[in-house]
Each structure stands twice: as C-alpha cells, then as structure tokens.
Amino acid sequence: MHRGKGMKFVGDSRIPAEKKPNIPKDYSEYPGKTEAFWPNFLLKEWMVGAVFLIGFLVLTIVHQPPLERMADPTDTGYIPLPDWYFLFLYQLLKYEYAAGSFTVVGAMIMPGLAFGALLLAPFLDRGTERRPWKRPVAVGMMLLAISAAVFLTWQSVATHDWAKAEEQGKITKEADIDTNAEGYKVFKEQGCISCHGDNLQGGAAGPSLVDSGLKPDEIKKIAVEGKGKMPAGVFKGNDKQLEELAKFISETTAK
C-alpha cells in the first residue's frame, strides 16, 4: 500500500487543555458547613487567643508573684514546696511505699508507668468511635489519671502547713550584725541561731528578730519563759548573759 492510500483524515485527535482561572470557592453554597480558613476561621482563633492573652497579662499586673526570701542552701529547716501542678507527685512521695528505700518506685517507676500508658493509649484504642461510652479503654485511663491527680493534689493542699510555709519564706529586712558583740556570742552559744538564723533573719522554726520592737525586759522574759512554739527553759545562761542577749536583740535594726 502506498503512503496515504486508503487513509481518511477525520479530525484532530488531540485533547485541548482547558485552563480555568483560580477562583475561590463560593462558601455561600454551603451555609454553616464550611468556611474559608483565611480569614474566617483563623480570625476567630486569633480573637480567642487575644482574650486569653489579655486576661493573663491583667492577672500578672493585678496579682504580685508570691516571692520568697533569697534561697539559702545552708538552711536545713526550710521545707521546699513544688508548684501546684506537681503537688500530686509531691504527695505521692510522702507515702511509705514511695519514699525512703522505695523512692525509686515513687519517683521513677510509677510516673514511668503513667506516661507509658499515655503513650500507648492511641495503640490500645484504635477505634473510630468518638462517643465516650464506646471508648472504654481510653476514657477509663483518662478518668483514672485525672482522679488520682486531683485526689493527691487535694491531699497535699489539705495536709500542708501553709502558715509555716509563709513564715519560712517571708522576706525579712537585712541588718548589720556585729558578730563580735557579746550579745551575738551569747546568741550563738545558747543555740538561738538554729531557729532564728545566723543573721537573726528567722526561718521555719522561729521568727525574725530584726526590728522586733521588743524591750530588753520583754526579750528576757521570752528567753526564760518561752512564747508560742518556743518552749520555756531554752536559755541556759546566767543573768549577765541574758542581759547582753536582750540588749543585743533590742538594738538590732534594719539598714
């Protein structure tokens, strides 16, 4: 057959590329079902975030932070307390089975099991259901964790001595202490330093003696008879030492 013989041209078989302009979808066709991410959805997110941010800034301005005195690593009477979101773990470490020789159990094993269960939760419950009563494993683990954290936090708050914690962290005035004074030597020899601090700044066991506002006779009476948590008979010195101690404390004032 010669070239072209017996063939008939019927038209162009190529498919033309139809170019359409990139027109955004008209969301009015689906009222209440969908919307544009920008700016409709994102603007709502920003507005909610702005409300929380402004509220947080107002709280930081209105309420002063609960600052305590400068940390002193030599103060063995200070009882530290974690922030509220760690109170449940703080309370857990108080129990016999999670403290002492079992500290590893309370500090490592139990939290490790809890976080391990949290990581395994997506693999333990792979269902497509969204109703809580049809997801017993995930919902049960969540309720158990929340209940335990709430109970331990409540126990920690209820059993903690907040008045003592406030007293031990109170910011006290500084004073120039003459460590060569006879009154300070008596103060140190009689063991007053263990409760009231080496600079008379006070602590968890005793109040600050700086700017006490007490007269020497009042100080002598307290040293002999005691007051509040201070028992009687703590002072073991003679009358001269008592006089020096009372004079020293009454004259100790802040800068």
Curated annotation (Swiss-Prot):
Keywords: Cell membrane, Electron transport, Heme, Iron, Membrane, Metal-binding, Transmembrane, Transmembrane helix, Transport. It is found in: Cell membrane. Heme c binds at residues 192, 195-196. It holds the Pfam family Cytochrome_CBB3. Its main location: membrane. Disulfide bonds: none annotated. The chain crosses the membrane at residues 46-62, 104-124, 137-157. It is a multi-pass membrane protein. One of its GO terms (cellular component) is plasma membrane. One of its GO terms (molecular function) is electron transfer activity. Residues 178-253 form the Cytochrome c domain. Its cofactor is heme c. The keyword Transcription does not apply. Belongs to the cytochrome b family. Component of the menaquinol:cytochrome c reductase complex. The main subunits of the menaquinol:cytochrome c complex are a Rieske-type iron-sulfur protein (QcrA), a cytochrome b (QcrB) and a cytochrome c (QcrC). PANTHER family: CYTOCHROME C-553-LIKE, MENAQUINOL-CYTOCHROME C REDUCTASE CYTOCHROME B_C SUBUNIT. This is Menaquinol:cytochrome c reductase cytochrome c subunit. It comes from Bacillus subtilis (strain 168).
